[in-house]
Amino acid sequence: MSGLLTDPEQRAQEPRYPGFVLGLDVGSSVIRCHVYDRAARVCGSSVQKVENLYPQIGWVEIDPDVLWIQFVAVIKEAVKAAGIQMNQIVGLGISTQRATFITWNKKTGNHFHNFISWQDLRAVELVKSWNNSLLMKIFHSSCRVLHFFTRSKRLFTASLFTFTTQQTSLRLVWILQNLTEVQKAVEEENCCFGTIDTWLLYKLTKGSVYATDFSNASTTGLFDPYKMCWSGMITSLISIPLSLLPPVRDTSHNFGSVDEEIFGVPIPIVALVADQQSAMFGECCFQTGDVKLTMGTGTFLDINTGNSLQQTTGGFYPLIGWKIGQEVVCLAESNAGDTGTAIKWAQQLDLFTDAAETEKMAKSLEDSEGVCFVPSFSGLQAPLNDPWACASFMGLKPSTSKYHLVRAILESIAFRNKQLYEMMKKEIHIPVRKIRADGGVCKNGFVMQMTSDLINENIDRPADIDMSCLGAASLAGLAVGFWTDKEELKKLRQSEVVFKPQKKCQEYEMSLENWAKAVKRSMNWYNKT
């Protein structure tokens, strides 16, 4: 394959040879691969559980050797399940969880440590000290003054910039400060840094290709989306050498081919994309004002903002959705952690056997009998922004049953959805065109209906909820001419059900007020100062 087909007319003239595309998603809970045909039907699948490691309280890691074995295995298993041969795969698209990173030896390819997950809290004290530092105050003040004179959007964004534990930036600083082996390698220019996409690309090509894409780069906290390059300002501020960061390429791009030794044939790698941006693409949220609500391990609310970046003061941050040739699509995003995490935790406590049971359990009750759950195993994100908040149940009584606990957990997910949506309406001045949901938790009809009621909007749930896989496959398919253009993708999308408001938001007012009170009491719990 000599290069990408970026012109729709050029693609249309290409022979539409038979074949399949692979969409692979390395999520926070599972790693999944689907084989898609031209009708975007899943012909074969494989899934394995991602094994997160918890070496210390608040630390979350992934063993790269285990992840690599799983990655190769799910591709082989999915292709086998589809009943096809590897040489029938015309392109591979890879979607990955974002801001989870690793460093490795440039000469040997050996990693210095495990992947440090986006959920990891080891840098929480660094985040606190940096955000309260004199240097940050000077940085913000300087940017505000310069913005006053120049009216530059970029400087306005910089004046609001704060570090979070979810960004790669200060977790990488923590590694540089605490692992002498990495420090030495950086000094000797023998260190590679990469998020999961970069590392997989490096492994798949046996070290011959080192790169990331714009969607993944923009979620690290080290990228300048206005200049479309790594941020000299931020990297200088926290002393991370720019030479440590990989080249940034288009999302739909000919990154190279998988080394033949791995699968027996050189499969073209033609899309790298961050999971939320991939889900946005898979949902066909191509127009300004299109909204995606992903409920997986965490909840992510994204709105397509066209070609303009939107910075807010409350908690929506600008991202690059994807870059394909000259087209750059921007998103504004906010998130809430511990969505699927809370359900999984409840399952481990034997409140239910299968997550599918929770919908029926919640619907069997009129309400939670005043029980509130605060989903804060990894702190509370926007609009509360409290990394020291604790997860908690409040309002427990002798009459409280596991059914009340389960309903309270599901209600908390819907309440967080409402918080994010209200903040989006307040801060992003773009009319909402449509809302589409995906992720494992969107299979729960109770959460979906309650969210629809609370925000008073229709929410479309697709027939295929694995949108990150489909998005990666769609981007790969467009790159090789497997699909002609976005219009063709829109025609292939299938909706399963549209949830419409059935109750007025006011009917939830008392429950929402009680929950907000519980959240307030859970905040700042772990703060040592």
Curated annotation (Swiss-Prot):
Name the positions where ATP binds. 28-29, 297, 340, 440
UniProt KW ATP-binding keyword: yes
Q: What class of enzyme is it?
A: transferase
Q: Where does glycerol bind?
A: 98, 275-276
InterPro entries the record matches: ATPase_NBD, Carb_kinase_FGGY, Carb_kinase_FGGY_CS, FGGY_C, FGGY_N, GK5
User: Of which family is this protein a member?
Assistant: Belongs to the FGGY kinase family.
Q: Which GO terms describe its molecular function?
A: ATP binding; glycerol kinase activity
Q: Which organism encodes this protein?
A: Homo sapiens
Q: Where in the cell is it found?
A: Cytoplasm
What is this protein's function per UniProt? Skin-specific kinase that plays a key role in glycerol metabolism, catalyzing its phosphorylation to produce sn-glycerol 3-phosphate. Involved in skin-specific regulation of sterol regulatory element-binding protein (SREBP) processing and lipid biosynthesis.
Swiss-Prot/TrEMBL catalytic activity: glycerol + ATP = sn-glycerol 3-phosphate + ADP + H(+)
Protein name (Swiss-Prot/TrEMBL): Glycerol kinase 5
Going by the UniProt record, its keywords in alphabetical order are: ATP-binding, Cytoplasm, Glycerol metabolism, Kinase, Nucleotide-binding, Transferase
Top-level taxon: Eukaryota
EC number per UniProt = 2.7.1.30
| Gene name of the record | GK5
- Keyword tRNA processing recorded: no
Which biological pathway? Answer: Polyol metabolism; glycerol degradation via glycerol kinase pathway; sn-glycerol 3-phosphate from glycerol: step 1/1
Cellular component (GO) terms are:
cytoplasm; mitochondrion
> Alphabetically, which GO biological process terms does the record hold?
glycerol catabolic process; glycerol metabolic process; glycerol-3-phosphate biosynthetic process; triglyceride metabolic process
PROSITE patterns cross-referenced by the UniProt entry: FGGY_KINASES_2
